[in-house]
Each structure stands twice: as C-alpha cells, then as structure tokens.
C-alpha cells in the first residue's frame, strides 16, 4: 500500500504528515489550540478519513492530562481509553491504554511499545494489538468522592458550586446524597465532577420509573452537560456506558 509524506488534500486544505490510503497520520510535536485541533480532526472524519494523532515528546509528561491530550484519545473495548506518543529520538511508538482518571484528575494507564522499524504502523493502529509483555501500570490513586467534594465546596470551586445549586433546587445537599453516588467511576476521565450530578439525576429517574429509561435520563442530562471534548470518541456510547454504571452501582447496598 503506497505511503505518502505530507500529501496535500485539496478538498480539506490539509497536509497530514503521513497518508496511508484513507488513514491520515498526524504527529503533533508542538502545542496546538484545542479549537484548531477539533477543526482539523472533524475535517478528516467528515471527509471519510481516519485520523491517527500521535503526540510528540512535549506531551504526556505530567500526572494530569491537558485538554489537547484528552482530546487525542480514542476508545474501543480491547484498549479502553487510549492515546499514542512517539519517541522520535529512539524510534519508538508508545500506546497508553486503559486510561483512567481519579475525581481530582490523576491519571493511571497501561503502556505498550513498538519500534518504528519492522512494524506495519497501519496494522498497529487498526488491529487493536496490545503487547502484553511490555505492559506497565502507573500508580492508581483512589480518592473519597465525598471528601473531595467537601474540599471543592470550601474553596468555592465553580463547577462544584453549580452542582450544589442543583441540589438546593431539589431540597438536597451535595454532601448528603445516597452513598452510591460518591463511589469511584471510570467516567471521571470524561465528565469529572458532573458524574455526581448525573448520578443524582439517575436516582431521580429511578424513583419515578423504578426501571429508568436511558432516553428520558439522557434528555435530562442534556440540560446540564458540557461541550463534548473528544472528537474521536462517540459521545452517546459513553453516556450509555455511564448509565449502565449507574444501574450497577445504585443496586448496591452500601
């Protein structure tokens, strides 16, 4: 299959670093505004291309992900939430997969590595391979959701105060909700503190319907949800999985 370097795509007015058929590979070494990143990504996707963002050495060096780093993430069942990084000096490609985040933003993940030479890059991207023998996991930090919320209220953190206001409108208090609402979530990565609000909305649906319906719950969520920041991840799919998590946790006897 032919490989084109910096091939110009006139309809998109974009020039990917590498073009493999309909796969546009972008190696992002310098900082890029989130708006421009989203524009470029959607331009590829809307014109029938897959886009593979690979971050350079200046990215993914902190315990918390920046907005751009999060937006470069993908999702599938085998790799979970994942993203890519290139070490151009040592000619290695890293996959950070099964990424999770605590409520305070600390990131945990597994990593796998390939050398550039002797490997089919397109196959690596599309086959969902994980090199089990090279997996490494960062320290997972667990946090008490209620204690974290209490600290945010003390410091009058804007998003948390906004959720508290929604509690007040319902004659509730953010720190005195059902215990399951404060449990850990694999959706903090996407939703951060909104997890607690959406769980409260789920519980309201549970009391009204006994068996909550995703569509009616999601209609409620849409009134409060923030802009979706992950152009390579299907939004509704994530919310359906979050809904399933609510169903599971709310059945616990805590």
Predicted feature residues:
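Basic, amphipathic alpha-helical patches used to engage nucleic acids or provide basic targeting signals
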Residues: 32-52
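Short acidic/polar capping segments at secondary-structure boundaries
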Residues: 10, 30-32, 57-60
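Active-site metal-binding core of divalent-cation-utilizing nuclease and nuclease-like domains
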Residues: 2-24
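Nucleic-acid nuclease catalytic cores
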Residues: 47-81, 88
């Amino acid at each position: 299959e032919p490989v084109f370097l910096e091939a110009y795509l006139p309809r998109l007015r974009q020039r990917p670093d590498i073009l493999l058929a309909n796969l546009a590979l972008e190696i992002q070494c310098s900082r890029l505004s989130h708006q421009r990143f989203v524009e470029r990504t959607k331009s590829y996707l809307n014109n029938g291309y897959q886009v593979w963002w690979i971050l350079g050495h200046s990215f993914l060096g902190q315990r918390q992900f920046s907005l751009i780093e999060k937006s470069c993430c993908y999702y599938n069942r085998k790799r979970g939430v994942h993203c890519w990084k290139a070490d151009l000096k040592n000619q290695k490609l890293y996959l950070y997969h099964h990424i999770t985040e605590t409520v305070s933003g600390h990131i945990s993940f597994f990593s796998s590595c390939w050398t550039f030479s002797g490997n089919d890059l397109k196959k690596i991207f599309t086959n969902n391979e994980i090199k089990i023998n090279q997996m490494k996991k960062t320290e997972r930090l667990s946090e008490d959701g209620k204690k974290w919320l209490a600290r945010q209220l003390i410091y009058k953190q804007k998003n948390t105060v906004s959720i508290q206001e929604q509690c007040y409108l319902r004659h509730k208090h953010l720190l005195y909700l059902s215990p399951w609402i404060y449990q850990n979530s694999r959706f903090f990565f996407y939703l951060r503190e909104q997890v607690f609000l959406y769980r409260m909305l789920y519980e309201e649906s549970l009391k009204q319907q006994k068996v909550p319906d995703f569509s009616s719950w999601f209609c409620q969520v849409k009134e409060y949800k923030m802009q979706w920041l992950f152009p390579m991840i299907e939004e509704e799919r994530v919310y359906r999985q979050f809904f399933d998590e609510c169903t599971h946790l709310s059945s616990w006897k805590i």
